[in-house]
Amino acid sequence: MEININTQGKETVAALCGRLDTLAAQESVAQFEALQEKARGTVILDCSKLEYISSSGLRLFLTLRKAADTKGGKVIVKDLSADVRKVFMITGFMNLFEFQ
Protein backbone atom coordinates (compact mmCIF):
# COMPACT_ATOMS: atom_id res chain seq x y z
CA MET A 1 0.00 0.00 0.00
CA GLU A 2 1.33 3.38 -1.00
CA ILE A 3 -0.14 6.77 -0.09
CA ASN A 4 1.12 9.93 -1.78
CA ILE A 5 -0.04 13.16 -0.13
CA ASN A 6 0.07 16.54 -1.88
CA THR A 7 -1.26 19.78 -0.38
CA GLN A 8 -2.02 22.99 -2.27
CA GLY A 9 -3.66 25.71 -0.24
CA LYS A 10 -6.65 24.28 1.63
CA GLU A 11 -6.90 21.21 -0.59
CA THR A 12 -5.04 17.99 0.17
CA VAL A 13 -5.02 15.05 -2.24
CA ALA A 14 -4.08 11.60 -0.97
CA ALA A 15 -3.53 9.10 -3.79
CA LEU A 16 -4.00 5.54 -2.52
CA CYS A 17 -2.35 2.76 -4.49
CA GLY A 18 -2.62 -0.97 -3.78
CA ARG A 19 -4.58 -2.95 -1.22
CA LEU A 20 -5.79 -1.32 1.99
CA ASP A 21 -6.09 -4.57 3.92
CA THR A 22 -5.76 -4.97 7.70
CA LEU A 23 -1.96 -4.95 7.72
CA ALA A 24 -1.73 -1.99 5.33
CA ALA A 25 -4.32 -0.10 7.40
CA GLN A 26 -2.19 -0.58 10.52
CA GLU A 27 0.85 0.66 8.62
CA SER A 28 -1.10 3.66 7.25
CA VAL A 29 -2.41 5.03 10.55
CA ALA A 30 0.27 7.75 10.78
CA GLN A 31 -0.47 8.97 7.25
CA PHE A 32 -4.21 9.12 7.95
CA GLU A 33 -3.50 10.99 11.19
CA ALA A 34 -1.51 13.52 9.12
CA LEU A 35 -4.56 13.86 6.85
CA GLN A 36 -6.73 14.51 9.91
CA GLU A 37 -4.51 17.50 10.71
CA LYS A 38 -5.35 18.90 7.26
CA ALA A 39 -9.08 18.20 7.61
CA ARG A 40 -9.97 21.88 8.12
CA GLY A 41 -9.98 22.19 4.34
CA THR A 42 -10.86 19.65 1.67
CA VAL A 43 -9.26 16.21 1.69
CA ILE A 44 -9.60 14.27 -1.55
CA LEU A 45 -8.96 10.54 -1.36
CA ASP A 46 -7.96 9.53 -4.89
CA CYS A 47 -8.89 5.85 -5.04
CA SER A 48 -8.26 5.32 -8.76
CA LYS A 49 -5.46 2.86 -7.93
CA LEU A 50 -7.00 1.39 -4.77
CA GLU A 51 -7.56 -2.30 -5.49
CA TYR A 52 -9.16 -3.48 -2.23
CA ILE A 53 -10.34 -2.11 1.11
CA SER A 54 -10.93 -4.06 4.32
CA SER A 55 -13.01 -3.07 7.34
CA SER A 56 -9.82 -1.68 8.90
CA GLY A 57 -9.36 0.54 5.86
CA LEU A 58 -12.97 1.67 6.07
CA ARG A 59 -12.36 2.61 9.70
CA LEU A 60 -9.52 4.92 8.60
CA PHE A 61 -11.83 6.60 6.08
CA LEU A 62 -14.55 7.03 8.72
CA THR A 63 -12.14 8.44 11.32
CA LEU A 64 -10.89 10.95 8.75
CA ARG A 65 -14.46 11.98 7.91
CA LYS A 66 -15.28 12.50 11.60
CA ALA A 67 -12.18 14.68 12.01
CA ALA A 68 -13.19 16.75 8.99
CA ASP A 69 -16.73 17.17 10.32
CA THR A 70 -15.36 18.38 13.65
CA LYS A 71 -13.02 20.88 11.98
CA GLY A 72 -15.50 22.16 9.40
CA GLY A 73 -13.75 20.48 6.47
CA LYS A 74 -14.86 17.80 4.07
CA VAL A 75 -13.64 14.53 2.59
CA ILE A 76 -14.23 13.65 -1.05
CA VAL A 77 -13.69 10.11 -2.30
CA LYS A 78 -12.69 10.05 -5.95
CA ASP A 79 -12.59 7.36 -8.66
CA LEU A 80 -13.60 4.17 -6.84
CA SER A 81 -13.16 0.95 -8.79
CA ALA A 82 -16.23 -1.25 -9.23
CA ASP A 83 -15.01 -3.72 -6.58
CA VAL A 84 -14.24 -1.06 -3.97
CA ARG A 85 -17.51 0.75 -4.79
CA LYS A 86 -19.36 -2.50 -4.07
CA VAL A 87 -17.77 -2.64 -0.59
CA PHE A 88 -18.85 0.96 0.04
CA MET A 89 -22.39 0.15 -1.10
CA ILE A 90 -22.71 -3.01 1.02
CA THR A 91 -21.40 -1.27 4.15
CA GLY A 92 -23.51 1.87 3.72
CA PHE A 93 -20.46 4.09 3.25
CA MET A 94 -21.94 5.51 0.03
CA ASN A 95 -24.17 7.61 2.30
CA LEU A 96 -21.26 8.96 4.37
CA PHE A 97 -19.03 10.58 1.77
CA GLU A 98 -19.13 12.90 -1.19
CA PHE A 99 -17.99 11.09 -4.35
CA GLN A 100 -16.48 12.23 -7.62
What are the residue ranges of the model-derived segments?
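Amphipathic alpha-helical interaction surfaces in cytosolic regulatory modules
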Residues: 19-96
